[in-house]
Amino acid sequence: GFEFDQRYSRFYQVILTGSGGLWNLMRLYANRHLSELNRNNPVVSGDTIRYLPLYQADQQSYFDKKMREKLGLPVDGLDFISPDAMDPSFFSLEMFDINDLYAAGNPAVVYQGYTPWGKRQRRVAPEKFFEDRENRPQNAFAPTYIALYAQDKFEFDKMFFNLGVRVDRFDANLPVLKDPYIVRPFYRAEETARLLGITLPQGVGGDWVAYVDNALNPTRIIGYRQGNTWYDANGAPTSALSIIRASGGRPRPHLKADSLTFEAFEDYKPQINIMPRISFSFPISDEATFFAHYDVLTQRPRAGQVAQFVDYLFIVQNATLDIPNPRLRPEKTIDFEVGFKQLLTSNIALSISGYYREMRDMVQLFSFFGGYPVSYTSFENLDFSTVKGLNVDIDIRRIGVLQLRFAYTLQYAQGTGSSVTSSRALIGSIEGFNVFRSLLPLSFDQRHTFTGTADIRFLERGVKGPAITIGEKVIYPLMGAGINITYNLGSGRPYTRYLLPNPADVQFGVNPVNLISGQPFSARLPWYNRFDIRVDRDFIIQRGENKQSILNVYVIFLNAFNQRNVLGVYPYTGLPDDSGYIQSPVGQQLAQNQYSKETFEYLYRLKERNPGNFGAPLRIRLGLLFSF
């Protein structure tokens, strides 16, 4: 088979409020050129001397000019205009030029596949962003995905095989930085050595990056870098901190220009993945079967890939934000399972299997510490995780009215990160720290899971239930009726305990650095259990001689016994409804400073009772299904 997929992702957003919103920008841009007084031309009126505003043409914004033109006022006039006093319908995006909208690194518009003024834009050459500075076009995200696959199922000597292979080609169709540490056009080490008339140390590659004493006019080399590994001037491994200290506070690569140009970018290298899929089974005996499968799967990066040139253009101003990384590769999963099925009796089957799943190239935050012109945080294919476990299933086929099924899973899930932002706290608190690489329990590491299902049903072809005779007619009132009971039991998932209560757990805008109690993800939530019950009955509706419809009436009880299951806790106390902050000395001091200590504590405790920390209570659903 063959598959081709190209999707176009466009978006346009105008930010109206806040410090970078359009309304605030209008206040800043209006009359900006009239902020000084013209002290060389005083206006004398009797005993009063007045100074008129000084018109500074080079300080006048494009927005101010367009606003005065639209009002019919002289562009170089001295009238003071208040945008807040005007009808909002008076304004339009066309009254702003690109520099006004970009606001020196705090853009009021975010766009992709549109013009900065909200009109749909055709695809252009990516370098147009740097060439057309009045429009700054940014293309829609248009990745291409091509796949070839083949699969065959056959039998050989009582062995059943299902073999397949899939070849994927993923192209993000995005320009990527030639080196993510350098947001500028730069020279490679061999070029730097040639320009300085020196020879590279033994072991230093010509395609490495040389760090020098002066970025544009170097006289000596201070160190080198290959990928994420740093070296001193002699080619010996060192750290980014050492290069920074030797460079006087900031590492300086040898640059072709100290401004961002298209020369700093290259095309995304398409990723080709070969994914074999193998499964087979064969009988061990007349009552037992062995089975196994091996799969390799890939998926496109989950997050952090769609970067725009504007992200790099203002990287100094936005270095505290997470900058997307367009060079991300697809994430890969390798899955292996082996097991056997055994028929214990004519009605009972046992299945036991063990599985191993490995996730590679998972996306995680990464700090490009020592980057130029500034260190920043982005994303890299760095995370990996393993999930291994054992499944045991017992299936009891229907005997009379009863059918049973029991399933148990023992699982161990470990990895370097549970989400793309798992490393944020460590990256932000340790200077020079790039990424967390230790194996820890993942957030979905649930050690034990048990599911039991019982289905009691009166069928027309089986046990019809009690009979009622009315005259010569025999009625089975329970025929077509049934009850299904599902029981779920599971051990708690891991979380990280803190040594101090955190007001950010309840309040907004407060997030102090906290200390971990023990190891990350070493604490566990409580076990949970819940019953779900479904009661239903089929009613046969005859439509003609040979046609009939079925009306199924059902009622479902979710969490039938209203179990109080804990899904989340506050990391200091380990409780779902008490963060521990209000009882702490800091919390008590905060409460004492309120107008009413009792009211503050009461409202704070109300907010602590986060319903998201608990499973849903008893819910009852009534429904109809009509089949014809």
Map each language-model feature to its residues:
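Residues that define the transmembrane beta-barrel architecture of outer-membrane proteins
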Residues: A142-I146, P270-I274, K332-F336, T386-K388, ...
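Transmembrane beta-barrel strands of outer-membrane/channel proteins
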Residues: F2-Q6, L163-R169, A292-V296, Q305, ...
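Gram-negative outer-membrane beta-barrel transporters
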Residues: S351-R493
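C-terminal beta-signal and adjacent terminal beta-strands/loops
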Residues: R461-K464, T469-P512, P526-R530, R537-F628
